[in-house]
Amino acid sequence: MNPWQALTSAGDSAVLLPLIVWITLWLIVPHESRRDGWRWVVAVGVCGGGVALSKLLFMAWDIGLPGLDYTGFSGHSAMSMLVWPTTAALLTRRANVSWRSVAIGLGILLALSIAISRIWLKAHSVSEVILGSAFGLLICGWFQKGKPVAQQVSVRAVTLLAGMSLLLVLACYGRVFPSQHILKQVALAISGHDMVFSRQMPLP
């Protein structure tokens, strides 16, 4: 596996979806963080739903952004920009502001690397990656703004989050979730067309 493929695998739904579910449970089960859990559900729903909608509009009805090489937001870019910085922030809730900022910065750097890998592997155009990354970062910022103070989280809870997250990533890394195939089937069903719309020119 080349480095770009290794990076892009870290942004696949096969890795991110189990991590999202685990973070949801980690936040919702304890009463004191339940509000945050529901905010997280909203953030994931808006991000994932926005990506899916942007792709379905293009695949089903050829609705895109005029003047851009665009077929919908890059899902890897958007979801990575939401999940990885958020994971870093949750893991460092007990740390001081400086360490939390460094951790979130590293999460954003990983998400940016995943986004760049999508361009390098010719999976998305530059516009799709930029728009997807900006969309995910915007939603991540909204979620982080409502995050409770660090002192409310126990060492045991953070250790549980870190350990299970690591196990999930190790178990799911390298797998590919058929999200694009699912969206194509949905686009065909809702449009009534025999084929979905696709990019006319190959990526440079």
Which stretches of residues belong to each language-model region?
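Helix-loop junctions on the outward
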Residues: 55-68
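Internal transmembrane alpha-helix with an interfacial aromatic "cap," most often the third helix
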Residues: 83-97
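Histidine-centered catalytic micro-motifs
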Residues: 68-82, 121-132
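Terminal transmembrane helix and immediately flanking juxtamembrane interfaces
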Residues: 1-57, 93-103, 109, 113, ...
